């Protein structure tokens, strides 16, 4: 099934006049930058823009609410657990697990709503109080919708139990009766309380007939003149047939008993049993499902879906799921009476009663301020195998699209982005690509955060992102002159070019200071030094210094010579290497052989003559520098002396 988008709602931004000015904007993962340009709509430029501000527009502001963040965190664990439900489970065991998951989601919504309610009460600022109260209303509506979807789509309650579930639904969400009961029963004489009959009526409207009978007993004790009528009505309440969860009677048996009970109620009305007490007579009419009597209690019913459930309770207690939408539509029409139009919540509930899952999701997406509700509800319904046929026209399915939108919103927050990773993981078609795009945009403010991001990328073999993050961290370290950290990140990124750059900085630092920093890192490069020639040279040059320090002069000399003759050393560093050879040339014992000395001489002359082998300008710089010229002369002298000593020594060895 394909579904095309409709025109989105227009959002007006205060201070921005798009009719006069051309706008400039740039999208981010969860935000948009917007500003007016200096051009008007005719294309003419003005020197000064009328609104020289840049606006940051956020599409998911709810992620910044402290309380709603608890909702996001708690539901994340439920979501991940749901994805791990074994596909092999079937029948009652699978259904029971899905119902349990749904109840867990609802409990999280309710806990969040109750906390928000307490904050709204405690708010000192009226504007904040109104904002929190608005959020309470939204959360209450979310729980109301979710609970109904649970009954109709997940429980899939059949005729009989369906009404019991709907009664529980109404009792849970129309809860003013509890505070009213506490108020009435808290007095010395409840039957004389001004709201006594309102309480009795509401109890009957909600099918709480045992409690209503108890209230009538109090009225009978306080008013003996109507005791007989109260007793008769109480007996009718007691004998009303209701299909209880543990009852084994069939629907046919229930319908026969209910029909008999209804005839008895009608007989009492026809006999004017309650004529002397209009309130009791009204209650009897309600129990007969009299629509006029029910509509007289509009104020106590408070909404059309309460009216619907009460109407079904007393007129068709064995209503079949397929007939629900007829009763729902007529109840809505009767309750509103043409005086007002349905609210968005009414449309959502009506779509649910029509068993139109996709319309429920669509209406919720429009009405609610974030993607949390529709993403999690759709995912749960998809696990119930109710959405397999619904694909969107751009290639993704509805579940994945909504999860991607929700996860994208989480990535706009400085800490909730970690939750978003798991949502992307469970989107098989576009999740990986979306995660790659979003994770590259996370600001790496601290090294701890960078390590978290890096670990996530490495666990998912996101090679390019790992390289990118490591390179960013390496560049930050270089800017802060933390060369050891920079080298570690470039090695981790396997970035040869950047490793070369950092190695050059190490060598330059050595030339300026005469010693290496971060010796532990350089000493333990291991196979990582093969990443680039310059890094190999850095590691080997440090090894030369270590050998020299250990007085292993022969090994040090061989390594130094190999660094020069293998062309691995940068030409700009040759003079430093030759200078390092001076102490070895001046040793009492001959370290360099005649052949090795010839090689050193050749390297020195190559450097002094300025052969442009590597295109570097160092030879020309040496010729112009008196100090370097002095070094060259000293090296020539030392090499000549060492050559003479080496020839004599080698000749003596041959003669012997």
From Swiss-Prot:
Give residue numbers for the modification (N6-acetyllysine).
Answer: 92
Q: Kindly list the positions at which N-acetylmethionine occurs in this protein.
A: 1
Location in the cell reads: Nucleus, Nuclear pore complex; Chromosome, Centromere, Kinetochore; Cytoplasm, Cytoskeleton, Spindle; Cytoplasm
What InterPro entries does the annotation carry? Nucleoporin_Nup85
Classification via Pfam families: Nucleopor_Nup85
The similarity annotation says: Belongs to the nucleoporin Nup85 family.
The name this protein goes by in its record = Nuclear pore complex protein Nup85
Q: Which organism is it from?
A: Mus musculus
Q: What is the lineage of its organism?
A: Eukaryota, Metazoa, Chordata, Craniata, Vertebrata
């Amino acid at each position: 099934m394909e579904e095309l988008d409709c025109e989105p709602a227009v959002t007006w931004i205060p201070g921005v006049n798009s009719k006069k000015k051309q706008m400039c904007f740039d999208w981010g993962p969860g935000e948009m930058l917007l500003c007016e340009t200096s051009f008007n709509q005719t294309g003419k430029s003005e020197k000064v823009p009328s609104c020289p501000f840049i606006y940051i527009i956020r599409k998911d502001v709810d992620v910044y609410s402290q309380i709603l963040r608890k909702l996001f965190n708690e539901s994340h664990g439920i979501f991940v657990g749901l994805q791990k439900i074994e596909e092999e489970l079937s029948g009652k065991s699978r259904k029971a697990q899905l119902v349990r998951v749904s109840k867990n989601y609802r409990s999280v919504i309710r806990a969040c709503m109750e906390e928000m309610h307490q904050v709204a009460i405690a708010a000192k600022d009226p504007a904040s109080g109104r904002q929190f109260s608005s959020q309470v209303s939204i959360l209450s509506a979310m729980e109301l919708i979710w609970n109904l979807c649970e009954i109709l789509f997940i429980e899939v309650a059949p005729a009989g139990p369906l009404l019991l579930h709907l009664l529980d639904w109404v009792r849970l969400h129309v809860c003013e009766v509890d505070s009213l009961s506490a108020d009435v029963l808290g007095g010395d004489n409840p039957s004389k309380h001004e709201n006594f009959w309102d309480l009795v009526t509401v109890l009957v409207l909600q099918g709480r007939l045992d409690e209503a009978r108890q209230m009538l007993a109090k009225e009978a004790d306080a008013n003996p003149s109507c005791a007989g009528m109260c007793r008769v009505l109480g007996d009718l309440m007691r004998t009303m047939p209701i299909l209880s969860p543990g009852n084994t009677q069939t629907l046919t048996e229930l319908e026969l008993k209910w029909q008999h009970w209804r005839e008895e109620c009608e007989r009492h009305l026809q006999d004017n049993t309650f004529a002397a007490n209009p309130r009791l007579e009204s209650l009897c009419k309600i129990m007969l499902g009299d629509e006029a009597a029910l509509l007289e209690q509009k104020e106590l019913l408070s909404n059309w879906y309460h009216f619907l459930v009460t109407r079904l309770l007393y007129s068709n207690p064995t209503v079949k799921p397929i007939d629900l939408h007829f009763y729902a539509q007529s109840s809505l029409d009767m309750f509103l009476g043409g005086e007002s139009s349905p609210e968005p919540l009414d449309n959502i509930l009506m779509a649910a009663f029509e068993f139109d899952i996709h319309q429920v999701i669509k209406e919720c997406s429009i009405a609610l301020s974030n993607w949390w509700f529709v993403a999690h509800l759709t995912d749960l319904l998809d696990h119930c195998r109710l959405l397999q046929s619904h694909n969107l026209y751009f290639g993704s399915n509805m579940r994945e699209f909504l999860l991607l939108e929700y996860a994208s919103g989480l990535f706009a927050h400085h800490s909730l982005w970690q939750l978003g990773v798991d949502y992307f993981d469970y989107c098989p078609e576009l999740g990986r690509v979306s995660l790659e795009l979003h994770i590259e945009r996370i600001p790496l403010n601290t090294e701890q955060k960078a390590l978290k991001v890096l670990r996530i990328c490495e666990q998912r073999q996101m090679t390019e992102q790992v390289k990118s993050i490591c390179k960013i961290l390496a560049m930050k370290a270089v800017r802060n002159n933390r060369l050891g950290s920079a080298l570690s990140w470039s090695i981790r990124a396997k970035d040869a070019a950047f490793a070369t750059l950092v190695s050059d900085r190490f060598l330059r630092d050595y030339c300026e200071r005469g010693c290496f920093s971060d010796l532990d890192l350089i000493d333990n490069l291991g196979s990582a030094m093969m990443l680039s020639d310059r890094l190999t040279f850095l590691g080997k040059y440090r090894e030369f210094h270590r050998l020299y320090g250990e007085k292993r002069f022969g090994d040090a000399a061989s390594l130094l010579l190999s660094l020069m003759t293998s062309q691995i050393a940068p030409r700009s560093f040759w003079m430093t290497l030759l200078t390092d050879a001076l102490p070895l040339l001046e040793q009492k014992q001959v370290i360099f052989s005649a052949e090795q000395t010839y090689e050193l001489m050749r390297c020195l002359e190559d450097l002094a003559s300025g052969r442009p082998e590597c295109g570097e300008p160092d030879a020309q710089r040496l010729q112009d520098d008196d100090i370097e010229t002095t070094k060259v002369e000293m090296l020539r002298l030392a090499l000549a002396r060492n050559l003479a000593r080496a020839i004599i020594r080698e000749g003596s060895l041959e003669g012997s």
